[in-house]
Regions:
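A short beta-loop-alpha structural element at the N-terminal edge
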Residues: 1-8
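Active-site rim helix/loop that mediates acceptor-substrate recognition in acyltransferases
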Residues: 17-44
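A short helix-loop-beta-strand connector motif used in the catalytic cores of GNAT acetyltransferases and
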Residues: 30-40, 49, 54-58, 77
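Conserved acyl-donor/pantetheine-binding loop and adjacent beta-alpha core of acyl/acetyltransferases
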Residues: 52-80
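A short, internal acetyl-CoA/4′-phosphopantetheine-binding micro-motif in the GNAT/acyltransferase core
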Residues: 79-89, 117-118
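Conserved acetyl-CoA-binding loop-helix of GNAT-fold acetyltransferases
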Residues: 83, 89-102, 130
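Conserved GNAT acetyl-CoA-binding A-motif
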Residues: 104-117
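Conserved active-site alpha-helix within GNAT-family acetyltransferase domains
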Residues: 118-137
Length: 151
């Protein structure tokens, strides 16, 4: 629904640079079409968090996705996850990842993701390490750097 897309787009843009910026709602629609697993977190019927994940084999052109595509036969890639600033540190991130872990475990999939290291996203690095992710690589781009993680 357009309302949901608008809300997800806005939440994504409010979470940059921790989450990659989207060019447009059309860009968001394309990501959702490519995705295999999504989850919305609601509070009083308002979207306060979301996650968008892709499986191996989709036609996603992200360099970060390609890092895992070149190394793994199968995986669940967390393309983006965002929580509204006013709803952080309330357990929503843990709840989203518990759902993702259950989904991935059902299909025996490793979960792959990256976290920005330049500019540094220390809260996300700390969170993913607490959730059991292990660093498996890093990459420097012209305007940012990332660390790659698997669980």
């Amino acid at each position: 629904c357009e309302f949901e897309l608008d809300a997800i787009f806005k939440l994504n843009q409010l979470n940059t640079p921790e989450v990659g910026a989207l060019e447009s709602i059309e860009h968001l629609k394309k990501l959702i079409e490519l995705s295999s697993y999504n989850l919305l977190m609601l509070h009083n019927e308002e979207i306060v968090g979301f996650i968008i994940c892709m499986r191996e084999g989709c036609m996603y052109e992200s360099e970060n996705y390609k890092f895992f595509k070149q190394r793994l036969k199968k995986f669940l890639y967390v393309d983006r996850v965002a929580i509204d600033l006013n709803h952080r540190r309330l357990g929503l991130g843990v709840a989203i990842y518990k759902d993702i872990f259950a989904h991935a475990n059902n299909e025996n999939l490793p979960i792959a993701l990256e976290v920005n290291t330049q500019p540094i996203n220390q809260p996300s690095l700390n969170f993913h390490e607490r959730m059991g992710f292990e660093k498996v690589g890093s990459r420097h781009f012209d305007d940012h750097s990332v660390a790659y993680f698997l669980k």
